[in-house]
Structures are given as C-alpha cells and as structure tokens.
C-alpha cells in the first residue's frame, strides 16, 4: 500500500485492500466500468452538483433511485459530490481512491464525513 494503515483508517472505518494504486483510473471511472480517469469538465475541479451528476450518469444509462443501486455518490451534501463507488453487495461497495488503491467496503456509507463525505445519492440502471 502507498501509505500506512493509519492513513486509510482516517478516511474510512471499513476498508479492505482490493488492488494496487494506479493513476490510470479514478473512482468514477471504476464505478462506471470505463477504467479511465473520468471526471467531466462540467463537474468543476473538485465537486459536482446533483443535477450535473444526474445528467452525466443518465448518458451512461443510470438514474437516481433508492432501490437496487449500482453506483453510489458521496459528498458534503447533494450539491457537492466528490466521490463514487460501485455496489458489490447488499451492504458492500468497492471504490478507487483517486490515484490510490482500490478498496472493498463493508458498508454503502463507509467514509468519515471529513474525507469523502457521506452517501448522498444512489443510482440504478435504467
């Protein structure tokens, strides 16, 4: 791992190493399956609004829904989305942390609010 465990513990209360660090893709690129560095220019440099995320993900076949989520969006609030993960089970998700590693999480809401933020929006396939 790139950093000591204490670094990762400060971001999430439940994380399990899944794959090595790489700058070739990020959280959104992993969640959508593109495995590229995916951050539309309409999102701005660090966060996106719910309307921006809804619009972008709709072009990929996703819509907001509380049921059967495929992609989870995190942030300070619904109009400050900064991170995404891919649902892998009823309570599990997997996320790429920027240029850092890929991690499994034992919760759909695994982050401390001071880092990636809380779960804000769930997206399902159309």
Whereabouts are the PLM-identified features?
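Generic structural signal for residues positioned in beta-strands
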Residues: 29-30, 71, 92, 121
């Amino acid at each position: 791992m790139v950093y000591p465990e204490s670094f990762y513990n400060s971001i999430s209360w439940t994380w399990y190493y899944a794959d090595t660090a790489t700058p070739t893709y990020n959280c959104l690129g992993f969640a959508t399956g593109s495995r590229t560095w995916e951050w539309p220019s309409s999102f701005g440099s660090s966060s996106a609004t719910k309307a921006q995320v809804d619009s972008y993900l709709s072009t990929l076949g996703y819509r907001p829904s509380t049921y059967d989520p495929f992609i989870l969006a995190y942030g300070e609030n619904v109009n400050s989305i900064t991170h995404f993960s891919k649902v892998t089970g009823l309570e599990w998700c997997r996320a790429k942390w920027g240029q850092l590693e890929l991690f499994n999480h034992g919760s759909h809401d695994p982050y401390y609010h001071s880092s990636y933020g809380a779960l804000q929006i769930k997206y399902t396939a159309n």
